[in-house]
């Protein structure tokens, strides 16, 4: 379980328009996880550059307990200014749209590399041999692939114990999986379960 290191208030005095900001001295972000509390509900930062808690694909343990997904930070600042575009003319472009996990699960790789950005990268020579110049990736931002039913609070007039308990036969059905990823997500964070290395951002950029 996670231990709460501290709680930082963001009062109205720190508000500029619809944005509230605070500066915290002396924090080292290397191993820091954080969330927001908005109107009593704990939620991850929608602009987080990294999400912790979904490193394993289709891990149903996230549905079996009150699993907490948190915002996190990259070890090093993401360098984007040095990146350059191939600038392939549109009339010469051959585009291939793929799903990172689906495309690379049967790539001949074994173990943890299957279904990752690294496995896709190793298939680039094959794609080039086909004449492909450009890849369009299906969602690679962080999203919850398991369709976890929302927990509803029981009204007072329903007796305790009248509904099936957690883990009963009626609740052991396989949860549905949003394989493609077209859903609400953390659009600034690469999907952790698609990463082979610890630094999934750098792996995707590479």
Name every feature range the model reports, one short phrase each.
Residues 1-21:
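Surface-exposed amphipathic alpha-helical tracts and adjacent flexible/coil segments at the periphery
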Residues 109-116, 147-206:
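Aromatic- and acidic-residue-enriched carbohydrate-binding clefts of CAZyme catalytic domains
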Residues 4, 36, 98, 127, ...:
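Conserved, mostly hydrophobic/aromatic
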């Amino acid at each position: 379980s996670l231990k709460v290191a501290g709680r930082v208030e963001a009062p109205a005095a720190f508000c500029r328009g619809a944005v509230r900001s605070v500066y915290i001295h002396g924090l080292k972000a290397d191993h820091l996880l954080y969330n927001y509390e908005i109107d009593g509900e704990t939620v991850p930062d929608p602009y987080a550059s990294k999400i912790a808690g979904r490193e394993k694909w289709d891990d149903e343990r996230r549905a079996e307990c009150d699993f907490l997904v948190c915002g996190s930070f990259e070890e090093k600042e993401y360098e984007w200014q040095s990146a350059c575009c191939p600038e392939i003319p549109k009339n010469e472009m051959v585009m291939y749209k793929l799903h990172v996990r689906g495309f690379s699960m049967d790539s001949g790789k074994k173990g943890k590399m299957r279904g990752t950005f690294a496995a896709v990268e190793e298939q680039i020579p094959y794609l080039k041999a086909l004449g492909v110049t450009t890849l369009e990736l299906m969602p690679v931002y962080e999203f919850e692939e398991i369709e976890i039913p929302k927990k509803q609070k029981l009204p007072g007039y329903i007796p305790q114990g009248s509904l099936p308990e957690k883990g009963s036969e009626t609740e052991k059905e396989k949860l549905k999986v949003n394989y493609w990823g077209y859903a609400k997500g953390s659009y600034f964070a690469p999907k952790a379960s698609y990463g082979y290395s610890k630094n999934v951002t750098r792996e995707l950029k590479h």
